[in-house]
Amino acid sequence: MGDKAGTRVFKKSSPNCKVTVYLGKRDFVDHLDQVDPVDGVILVDPDYLKERKVFVTLTCAFRYGREDLDVLGLSFRKDLYISTFQAFPPIAEERKANSRLQERLLKKLGQQAHPFYFTIPQNLPCSVTLQPGPEDTGKACGVDFEIRAFCAKSIEEKIHKRNSVRLVIRKVQYAPEKPGPQPMVETTRSFLMSDRSLHLEASLDKELYYHGEPISVNVHVTNNSTKTVKRVKISVRQYADICLFSTAQYKCPVAQVEADDQVSSSSTFCKVYTLTPTLDKNREKRGLALDGKLKHEDTNLASSTIVKDVTNKEVLGILVSYRVKVKLVISRGGDVSVELPFVLMHPKPTELPISRPHSAVPESDPPIDTNLIEFESNSFSQDDDFVFEDFARLRLKGMADDEDC
């Protein structure tokens, strides 16, 4: 039997090791027309279960204040969405076809394992973390998704950390396959005591950029006025629309260039400036929007948010966008500036895990998918097909161990 890569499965157990949750992935992609389903398996010790039921909840929450300020029953957190699934005993009308991964896990784990399934609504925001300050402790502000599994006689029963499993997943978006048109903007400015005007034209080399990719800004100035351009300032700005009780917008420069390029009266000027917005140069900026964090992985600037219906006022959370600002500093005449919107995202991975009903797979000659279980009748040890990885969340500075998800 040749060597082959096993199927990665993330798992996390309760502190008392009586409840364990298994998931095939941690990132669930928003494709705009639908979101990847959240399907997993929960394993419960039968001696511990007794007469109780098994519940799994999916919560999307927006934390908008420091955790240490949660006093007197007041919490700076708003639950945007809560869904509950009763895994055992199963409810007939909630039963759905198991995915291939669920079928394989159920076969491996035995009769004490139970499948669960959630559908994430499309109007929920993507996972975004607001960068904490040096003195901030506890959970960072932002939007996150959490799965919680526990045993109880009813859903209203108080849940204890010792016998429940909490793990954080992410709702993410990837760059569209077809980028938009090349951004270009122009403006003309007239000045007092000057018969002629100044014309500024700016453009980007494309509309879609991947994280870490340099941005080329083409600046063309035709100065027919009597004024002189003293300096040129180029900046990349992140805009975060906080949509909760009301809508507020916060902007933060993430890359900037200032050049002493002068444009005299009755002359033209053309130059390409290059900027690369990265988190490494902005780690001290409190409140900067970042992609949601998982495990012990570093993150990056928050990806641009793509909204399917821009007129939908029910979208809550943090909506992120980016613009390049080109500013000309004029001698004794004020400033002339334009803005160019662009999209900053991760490319779509070549192979994404896909959750499909087991019944949808043909019985003969199934397509090979490295992200799914391969059913083999001649396998000596099907257990070797699994690579279990503990499910953990990036531990922020000052965060207690029991909050590590």
UniProtKB/Swiss-Prot annotation:
For this record, the Gene Ontology CC terms, alphabetical, are:
cytoplasm
* Keyword annotations of the record: Cytoplasm, Sensory transduction
Which PROSITE patterns is this protein grouped with? Answer: ARRESTINS
Residue intervals passing through the bilayer: none
Where does the UniProt annotation locate this protein?
Answer: Cytoplasm
Q: Which cysteines are joined by disulfide bonds?
A: none
The GO biological-process annotations, alphabetized, read as: G protein-coupled receptor internalization; nervous system development; positive regulation of ERK1 and ERK2 cascade; signal transduction
Q: Name one GO molecular function term.
A: angiotensin receptor binding
The record's family statement is: Belongs to the arrestin family.
Q: What is this protein called?
A: Arrestin red cell isoform 2
Origin organism is Oncorhynchus mykiss
